């Protein structure tokens, strides 16, 4: 890694520390937390952070595949919303408790998200729509249709509670002190995340498809010249973003056991944070996953701080911790190089 890039990535750590120090210094009551806060960071906290990492990291990795292909998909938030709503709606329709129903609900959510991503791809690739506007449309449509669907089905924007995913302990490993319950006694979407991160890196960097995908976003004309269909590559990249968001949205919803449609819905900006993670990670799935865990960890921390008895801190103030950290870290990271042809339409006849 060259010196400027190393310096920029080191700024991420510095930014995180400064953000936390700022909160500690500015918020009355934080200085008195002391040992209570230290006690929060246990195996249960790590499991909670990993659960919250799932939608952010999968959205971030999905965004990498789309943008590397040359299509900027800022509709990740909308895809997560569609997936979360579909998962709970199908789970509720099937009775809401058994493992088979959860599996069906999970796949239904992935299919729904991938279908919306396909429509987005068609609008952008075939009809050459502005990708930013189309992505915003996906988000706004999802933000309206999911709560509306909730009202139609349940007569309220929030669904009734359904079953939640059980943790799956791995024999022997789950019994290790601290690390065992934190990493090896988690739910299926978290295990999927552990597999998806190295798989995504390998797919992007060590396969012919990955090379074609990156060429599609850097120099589609050259890729077309050697006989590779740029349209198909871009469709595949966007569809992968839909599949990944489907996994992330379904994972969050089925871990929660309810769809919350009020306000920004239960997704609550995680798709937007997913975009920042791959910018921070410079379009590297591993970097995006690490950034996702950092922000999810802050999210989990603010939830724990609100729960601790005796700490009188505004829940609204504590809730902005992850978003303040996003701004600080992005400031320290600086410019990230986008694919040269990202956002540009390609017509082989031109």
Question: Can you say where each PLM-predicted feature lies in the sequence?
Answer:
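Cytosolic-side transmembrane-helix boundaries in multi-pass membrane proteins
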Residues: 1-27, 225-232, 305-350
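Helix-loop-helix "hairpin" substructures at the membrane interface of multi-pass membrane proteins
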Residues: 185-260
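Transmembrane helix-bundle core of multi-pass membrane transporters
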Residues: 143-203, 309, 313-314
């Amino acid at each position: 890694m060259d010196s400027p890039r190393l310096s920029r990535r080191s700024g991420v750590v510095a930014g995180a520390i400064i953000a936390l120090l700022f909160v500690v210094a500015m918020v009355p009551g934080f200085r008195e937390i002391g040992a209570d806060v230290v006690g929060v960071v246990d195996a249960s906290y790590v499991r909670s952070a990993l659960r919250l990492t799932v939608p952010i990291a999968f959205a971030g990795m999905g965004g990498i595949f789309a943008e590397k292909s040359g299509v900027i998909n800022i509709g990740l938030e909308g895809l997560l919303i569609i997936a979360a709503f579909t998962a709970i709606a199908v789970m509720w329709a099937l009775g809401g408790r058994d493992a088979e129903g959860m599996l069906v609900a999970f796949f239904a959510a992935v299919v729904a998200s991938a279908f919306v991503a396909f429509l987005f791809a068609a609008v952008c690739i075939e009809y050459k729509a502005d990708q930013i506007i189309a992505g915003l449309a996906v988000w706004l449509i999802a933000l309206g249709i999911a709560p509306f669907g909730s009202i139609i089905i349940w007569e309220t924007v929030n669904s009734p509670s359904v079953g939640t995913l059980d943790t799956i302990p791995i024999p022997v490993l789950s019994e290790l002190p601290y690390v065992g319950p934190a990493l090896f006694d988690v739910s299926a979407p978290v295990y999927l995340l552990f597999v998806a991160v190295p798989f995504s890196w390998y797919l992007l960097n060590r396969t012919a498809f990955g090379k074609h995908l990156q060429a599609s976003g850097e120099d589609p004309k050259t890729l077309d010249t050697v006989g590779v269909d740029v349209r198909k590559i871009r469709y595949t990249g966007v569809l992968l973003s839909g599949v990944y968001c489907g996994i992330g949205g379904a994972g969050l919803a089925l871990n929660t056991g309810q769809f919350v449609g009020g306000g920004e819905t239960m997704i609550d900006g995680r798709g937007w944070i997913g975009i920042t993670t791959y910018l921070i990670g410079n379009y590297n799935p591993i970097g995006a996953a690490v950034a996702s865990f950092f922000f999810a960890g802050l999210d989990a921390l603010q939830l724990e701080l609100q729960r601790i008895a005796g700490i009188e801190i505004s829940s609204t103030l504590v809730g902005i911790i992850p978003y303040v950290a996003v701004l600080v870290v992005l400031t320290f990271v600086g410019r990230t190089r986008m694919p040269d042809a990202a956002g540009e339409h390609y017509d082989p006849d031109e």
